[in-house]
C-alpha cells in the first residue's frame, strides 16, 4: 500500500503543472479561468478514479497538452468558433470514442495513418506548443517584414527565459515534478519583478470556484458542417493515439503487459478515457486523456488502481488551492510549454529520412503546424502530401483506402489548397480506381503507436 500511495503522489507531482497551464491556455478563448481550473481538477480526478476502478491500472488522466492548444488556437482563434461550440465538439468526440471503443473499431483508425506521419504529428504538436509558450511570453512577436522576430526584453519575457532555463536544469538533474517546481519558482521570482500580481489580502486556500460559467455550456448549432466533421475526426484521432500510445509505452516491460504484448484491461482503460472526455467537456475543459507522466508513478512501483486513486485524491485536494494556481502568470508556464515541446520531439529520430516519400510529408506536417498556427491544417497538408507523393511515385499500394477517404474529399481539399494558391484534382478520383483493382492483394500493415502529447 505504501509503495502504491507514494507512486500516486509521484504521478501527481509530475503532472500538477496542468492545473496552472490549462486555465492559462483555455482562458485565452474567453473562458472563465477560475471555472476552467475547477473543471480541470474535477475532470482529472473523476477520469483518474474511472481508470482506477474500471481498469485497475496505475494511470492518471487530465486535459491533454496539445489538444488544449488545438482547442484554443485552432478551433476558437483560428477557425472562429465560439468556445461553447468547441466544447460541444469535444463532447461529441467523447461519445464517438465511446462507440469506437465499445465496438473495437479503434484498431482500424490506428491502422489508417502511416507510421512516419504519426511521428511527425507528435513532433509537430510539440513544436506548436513551444511556439505558443514563446509567443505568449513576448519572446517571439509579429513583424510586418519578417512575419516573426525576437521581442523586447520586457520583465515578462525575461521571466519566461528564466523559466525555460530553470525547468531545463531541474529536468537535467532528474528532479521529480520538475515542470511543477519550475512554474512555482518562476511565479515567486515574478513577484518582485511585477509580473506575478499578488492581490491585497491574498489567501492561498479557498472553497472551490463555481463551475457555472462553463458547466454544460454547449453550442451544437455550428457542428453540422464538413469542416467541423473533420475537426471532430481530428480530435478523435489525437485522443485515440495519445491514449493507446501512452498505455502501451508506460506499461512496457512490466507485468501489466500480457504474453502477446498487449496491455491488460486496455479496453476498460480506453472506455474510462472516452467517458472522461465527455465528462470533462460537460464540466468545461478540453479533451481529457491518459498522461504519459503516469510512467513516473509506474517507475516508483505503482501497479494497481490504488496508485490512480491516490493521484485522483490529490486532484480533489487541489480544488481548495485554486488561488495559488490561478496566481501563476502565463510567463511562468512558458518553461513547461517549451519542455513539453522538447519531450515530444523525441519522435523525430524515428522518422525515416532516407525515403523522401516518407520524409517530405512528415516535414510538411511539422512545419505547417507551426507556420499556419493550426494543428488541423498541418495534419491535413501532411496527409494530402503523403497520398500525392505515394500515388505519383508509383507506391500507391502503401496508401490505405481509409486514409484516402478520410483525408481528401473534394470539398476539404479545395478549401485547404485554396489557402496556399493551388488547384488539384481530387486524389480520391485518381486513387480509388487503382486501389479497387489491387485492394484484395494489398492488406494494410498494423503499425506501432506513438504518443501524441
Language model segments and positions:
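Loop-to-helix transition at the N-terminal end of transmembrane alpha-helices
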Residues: 30-49
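Helix-loop-helix junctions within the multi-pass membrane cores of secondary transporters/permeases
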Residues: 1-22, 43, 64-125, 252-347
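Juxtamembrane transmembrane-helix boundary signature
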Residues: 45-65, 96
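Cysteine-centered motifs
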Residues: 422-424
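Helix-loop-helix hairpins and the membrane-proximal interhelical loops
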Residues: 1-35, 149, 181-267
